From Swiss-Prot:
Domain of life from the UniProt record: Bacteria
Positions where 4-aspartylphosphate occurs in the chain: D58
GO CC annotations on file: cytoplasm
Species of origin: Myxococcus xanthus (strain DK1622)
NCBIfam families: PRK00742.1
Residue intervals of the Response regulatory domain: 7-124
GO molecular function: phosphorelay response regulator activity; protein-glutamate methylesterase activity; protein-glutamine glutaminase activity
Record-given protein name: Protein-glutamate methylesterase/protein-glutamine glutaminase 4
Keyword presence, Repeat: no
Ranges of residues in domain CheB-type methylesterase: 158-350
Similarity comment: family membership: Belongs to the CheB family.
Gene3D superfamilies per UniProt: 3.40.50.2300, Methylesterase CheB, C-terminal domain
Entry text on domains: Contains a C-terminal catalytic domain, and an N-terminal region which modulates catalytic activity.
Entry's localization field: Cytoplasm
Length: 353
């Protein structure tokens, strides 16, 4: 029933950490714990038997780790999965791979009641579980180790009168996997810098950058304030900082106030890009929950920039791109498999790719 609590399966091998997670979840009457798994094998079995609303997934577990368990669940019994990980390098990289395998979000494992951030971290965990439990996980993108299915070549988009000078991308839920696929298909000769705002838990931005470096030939890094924005380089917004552009083509990393609760904010980035590049701006709104980016896209559209939005079918969550399309601000709505070719086509005949 609509008002029944969401049914959570907790997968965690440490008894202490598992008890803590169960207590945090049970503190919210909108959530209930229906099962506890001590390893990945149990997580898959319980997901099949209990059909929970969502699974919280540890990464390092005996018998089967969280990455393989996520893959199995997404293949055998598609269920929203939220990775709850430590900030250990090995765990961060595996967490990123779990996002590509189908997990919707990654959160830092709460440190315990003695931590000054415990209440805020616990509330963030519960809020994330409630939001992600509503996501319909019914599709998986094929792994690039398998031969890609042939797709028709899309018609060339209308040529913009102004050659883009930057590409600004925004994403939330489902974004890491979408970014990985996009970057795997862009050429090393891509002629302009790419800025990225990806909503992700604090502590995971550097790990995300390291993981995205393995996708393809483009260098990926967390942006530093004042550094020059180089063609064919990808710059991610740092933890809890806005990312934009200074007028002279350098990165601006800012501690300015959050925009509608977000820092980094897609709207902040799009506004900055619109001011710096005007009609030479190209914005891409990828899969994500909520409306971050809408007002910034509105300003970028008014400045003459071009806007692409991911289509509903290839989006994990059609929130961020959906509101842009609904506001009639998108010049094109593009399926994820076609996005790289759309971007490269924007530079054909103008000295670019």
């Amino acid at each position: 029933m609509k008002n029944d609590p969401l049914r959570i399966l907790v997968a965690e091998d440490s008894p202490t950490a598992r008890r803590l997670l169960v207590e945090i979840v049970r503190a919210d009457p909108a959530l209930t714990v229906v099962g506890e798994a001590r390893d990945g094998v149990e997580a898959v079995e319980l997901a099949q038997r209990l059909r929970p609303s969502l699974v919280t997934m540890d990464i390092q577990m005996p018998r089967m780790d969280g990455l393989e368990a996520t893959r199995r669940i997404m293949t055998e019994v598609p269920t929203p999965v939220v990775v709850v990980s430590t900030l250990v390098e090995r765990d961060i990289q595996t967490s990123m791979a779990a996002l590509r395998a189908g997990a919707l979000a990654v959160l830092q494992k709460p440190l315990g009641p003695e931590s000054p951030d415990f209440d805020a971290d616990s509330r963030r965990l519960r809020d994330t579980l409630k939001a992600m439990a509503e996501v319909k996980v019914v599709r998986r993108w094929p792994d690039r180790t398998a031969p890609p299915a042939p797709v028709p070549t899309p018609p060339a988009p209308p040529v913009s009168p102004t050659r883009p000078g930057v590409v600004a991308l925004a994403a939330s839920t489902g974004g890491p996997a979408a970014l990985f696929r996009l970057l795997s298909e862009l050429p090393a000769s891509f002629p302009v810098p790419l800025l990225v705002v990806q909503h992700i838990a604090i502590g995971f931005s550097e790990g995300l950058a390291q993981w995205l470096r393995t996708a393809g030939p483009l260098p990926v890094k967390v942006a530093e304030d004042g550094e020059p924005l180089l063609p064919g380089h990808v710059y991610l917004a740092p933890d809890d900082r806005h990312l934009g552009v200074r007028g002279e083509g350098r990165a601006e990393v800012s501690r300015a106030a959050p925009v509608n609760g977000f820092r980094p904010s897609a709207t902040w980035m799009f506004r900055s890009v619109a001011r710096a590049y005007g009609p030479a701006s190209l914005a891409v709104i990828l899969t994500g929950m909520g409306q971050d980016g809408l007002e910034g896209v509105r300003e970028l559209h008014g400045a003459g920039g071009r806007i692409l939005a991911q289509d509903e079918q290839s989006s994990v969550v059609y929130g961020m791109p959906g509101v842009v399309v609904g506001a009639n601000l998108a010049h094109e709505v593009v399926a994820l498999p076609d996005l790289a070719s759309r971007l490269t086509s924007a530079f054909r005949g103008s000295g670019g790719v």
